[in-house]
């Protein structure tokens, strides 16, 4: 059997969210008792918690919701590239060492350890021209191990708007701590949420061959 890597962080009340966004909340609607045959919970959360896929609707009014986005970009050959300690922005120079023959999907690991249970504004994001550089090489999906492809302080979301213009897809908040550089098969399908601006994904990598 081919090896799998689970690159989705656990989702719980401790999961970090952007300040002001909705944290994970869960309570039990029904509990298993002699009079009730099941446990059923109610969950409230931001669709941007944990590993998730942004929809174009997230950064453009009237653009498609995540349930209307084609699934093909979220499934297929992928390359993981390490850009550890790249600083605030991922630049082409951080990726060139692994850029020969890029597959259509690129995930970048920027940190030794992902922030699983604390929020920090000090995370790495994509420089907009890096996304252009990847798009010119046939990349249709990018991802990373931080909360956003734009800096936390950005009010213009320049990298998101490159994604929009290039009709690319994005995965954020991935857990790449234990993944070596190299090529894999990515499987990270969003839910068919008809009106949502994003969706949680259970992102995994599978060895090729």
Swiss-Prot record:
<keyword id="KW-0479">Metal-binding</keyword>
<comment type="function">
    <text>Catalyzes the hydrolysis of N-formyl-L-kynurenine to L-kynurenine, the second step in the kynurenine pathway of tryptophan degradation.</text>
</comment>
<dbReference type="InterPro" id="IPR017484">
    <property type="entry name" value="Kynurenine_formamidase_bac"/>
</dbReference>
<comment type="subunit">
    <text>Homodimer.</text>
</comment>
<keyword id="KW-0862">Zinc</keyword>
<keyword id="KW-0378">Hydrolase</keyword>
<dbReference type="GO" id="GO:0004328">
    <property type="term" value="F:formamidase activity"/>
</dbReference>
<comment type="pathway">
    <text>Amino-acid degradation; L-tryptophan degradation via kynurenine pathway; L-kynurenine from L-tryptophan: step 2/2.</text>
</comment>
<dbReference type="GO" id="GO:0004061">
    <property type="term" value="F:arylformamidase activity"/>
</dbReference>
<keyword id="KW-0823">Tryptophan catabolism</keyword>
<dbReference type="InterPro" id="IPR037175">
    <property type="entry name" value="KFase_sf"/>
</dbReference>
<comment type="similarity">
    <text>Belongs to the Cyclase 1 superfamily. KynB family.</text>
</comment>
<feature type="binding site">
    <location>
        <position position="52"/>
    </location>
    <ligand>
        <name>Zn(2+) 1</name>
    </ligand>
</feature>
<dbReference type="Pfam" id="PF04199">
    <property type="entry name" value="Cyclase"/>
</dbReference>
<dbReference type="GO" id="GO:0008270">
    <property type="term" value="F:zinc ion binding"/>
</dbReference>
<feature type="binding site">
    <location>
        <position position="172"/>
    </location>
    <ligand>
        <name>Zn(2+) 1</name>
    </ligand>
</feature>
<protein>
    <recommendedName>
        <fullName>Kynurenine formamidase</fullName>
        <ecNumber>3.5.1.9</ecNumber>
    </recommendedName>
</protein>
<feature type="binding site">
    <location>
        <position position="54"/>
    </location>
    <ligand>
        <name>Zn(2+) 1</name>
    </ligand>
</feature>
<dbReference type="GO" id="GO:0019441">
    <property type="term" value="P:L-tryptophan catabolic process to kynurenine"/>
</dbReference>
<feature type="binding site">
    <location>
        <position position="54"/>
    </location>
    <ligand>
        <name>Zn(2+) 2</name>
    </ligand>
</feature>
<feature type="binding site">
    <location>
        <position position="172"/>
    </location>
    <ligand>
        <name>Zn(2+) 2</name>
    </ligand>
</feature>
<feature type="active site" description="Proton donor/acceptor">
    <location>
        <position position="58"/>
    </location>
</feature>
<feature type="binding site">
    <location>
        <position position="48"/>
    </location>
    <ligand>
        <name>Zn(2+) 1</name>
    </ligand>
</feature>
<dbReference type="InterPro" id="IPR007325">
    <property type="entry name" value="KFase/CYL"/>
</dbReference>
<feature type="binding site">
    <location>
        <position position="160"/>
    </location>
    <ligand>
        <name>Zn(2+) 2</name>
    </ligand>
</feature>
<dbReference type="GO" id="GO:0043420">
    <property type="term" value="P:anthranilate metabolic process"/>
</dbReference>
<feature type="binding site">
    <location>
        <position position="18"/>
    </location>
    <ligand>
        <name>substrate</name>
    </ligand>
</feature>
